[in-house]
């Protein structure tokens, strides 16, 4: 078992601050956007949905180019560019007088696609054996940002409106840039220049990375589909109102962080990582079946949430760590950009399928369907793990 070195820990915490600030600003909008945007002039459900979803389309389109750019010009300059674009989109949305202006601002926000470059920067500063731990620390910061946003979003929106939330998001993005250059050291110099696009595409479609990219597609599709129905399930079965659902998320996230910390200490090899990924996929199936139980028991909701977020957070740490280990160092940014593209693609499709499932099959039907999809992923993963292990040797 390898412990994090002092530089690895320092860099992990600093980068967590950068990522956490950006994600907190992003999460602030989500709990209240639909309710407030529907009151704007000429608002329709289609336009409200477009305003929410167009961010993900921008992310999908630009993750690979931004990751490739980080391989060529450096991680910190690329992340800075992405954060400036994100801040610009936030300002545009804050100044907008109608939903169309907000849609344009959200589209510009999505073009600041820095997830792949940020994960590549974390990988640059960590040893292979410790990379999952570094990703876990960053994942915890995202989880905390999510819970904090759930707590403060409604009060802030009530006092300052959507314009105030978008303005705060822009300020947080600029603060993240300050953190990036003040606290995060420059990554080690690479001796090999980034490859041409043809080589990058060949690397992205290699079987070992396809298995992992398909996995994150399934994982985030399941997450988004579940969040279409999760708030209603928590109200119905656990008796927790929409404004108070952080009371469930906070202890569940804390407990899942403890589970993650305990397990990741023992995951160092590629083979161990794949065993953990398979186990987490199985746990996701079980958690979705707990949600689908239909018994309207609060303890099943709590158990399902603990299983779901423990497995999800472990996967969030392990999958990108494995991508960074299997990709060539000089194409790491592009590889993690492709990974992030699949992540956002899965989230987009999951939202659509989740809404369809809820409308036509109800809460229990949606979660039964999600469990079936998770089981399909588990089967594919069981067959595909050999591709990862064979090419990792």
Q: Where are the model-predicted features located?
A:
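C-terminal transmembrane helical hairpin of 12-TM major facilitator-type secondary transporters
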Residues: 274-319
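Cytoplasmic helix-loop-helix junction between adjacent transmembrane helices
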Residues: 105-142
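Helix-to-loop junctions at the C-terminal end of transmembrane segments
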Residues: 62-74, 259-272, 358
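C-terminal membrane-cytosol helix-exit motif in multi-pass small-molecule transporters
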Residues: 171-189, 380-384
């Amino acid at each position: 078992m390898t412990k994090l070195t002092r530089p690895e820990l320092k860099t992990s915490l600093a980068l967590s601050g950068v990522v956490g600030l950006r994600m907190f600003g992003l999460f602030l909008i989500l709990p209240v956007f639909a309710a407030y945007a529907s009151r704007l002039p000429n608002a329709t459900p289609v336009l409200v949905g477009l305003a929410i979803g167009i961010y993900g389309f921008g992310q999908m389109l630009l993750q690979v180019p931004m990751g490739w750019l980080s391989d060529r010009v450096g991680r910190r300059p690329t992340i800075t560019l992405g954060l400036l674009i994100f801040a610009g989109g936030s300002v545009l949305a804050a100044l907008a007088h109608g939903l169309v202006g907000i849609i344009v601002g959200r589209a510009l926000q999505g073009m600041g696609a820095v997830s792949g470059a940020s994960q590549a920067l974390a990988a640059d500063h960590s040893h292979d054996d410790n990379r999952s731990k570094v990703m876990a620390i960053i994942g915890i910061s995202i989880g905390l940002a999510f819970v904090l946003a759930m707590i403060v979003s409604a009060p802030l929106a009530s006092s300052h409106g959507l314009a105030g939330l978008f303005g705060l998001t822009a300020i947080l993005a600029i603060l993240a840039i300050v953190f990036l250059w003040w606290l995060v050291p420059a990554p080690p110099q690479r001796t090999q220049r980034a490859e041409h696009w043809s080589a990058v595409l060949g690397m992205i479609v290699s079987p070992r990375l396809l298995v992992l990219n398909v996995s994150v597609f399934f994982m985030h599709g399941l997450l988004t589909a579940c969040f279409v129905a999760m708030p209603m399930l928590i109200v119905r079965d656990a008796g927790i109102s929409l404004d108070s659902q952080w009371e469930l998320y906070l202890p569940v996230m804390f407990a899942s962080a403890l589970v993650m910390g305990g397990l990741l200490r023992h995951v160092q090899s590629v083979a161990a990582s794949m065993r953990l990924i398979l186990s987490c996929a199985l746990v996701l199936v079980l958690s979705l079946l707990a949600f689908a139980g239909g018994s309207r028991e609060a303890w099943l909701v709590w158990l399902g949430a603990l299983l779901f977020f423990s497995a999800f957070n472990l996967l969030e740490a392990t999958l990108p760590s494995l991508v960074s280990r299997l990709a060539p160092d000089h194409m790491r940014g592009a590889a993690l950009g492709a990974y992030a593209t699949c992540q956002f693609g899965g989230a987009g499709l999951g939202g659509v399928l989740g809404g369809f499932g809820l409308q036509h099959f109800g809460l229990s039907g949606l979660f039964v369907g999600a469990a079936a999809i998770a089981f399909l992923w588990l089967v594919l993963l069981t067959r595909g793990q050999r591709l990862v292990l064979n090419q990792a040797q």
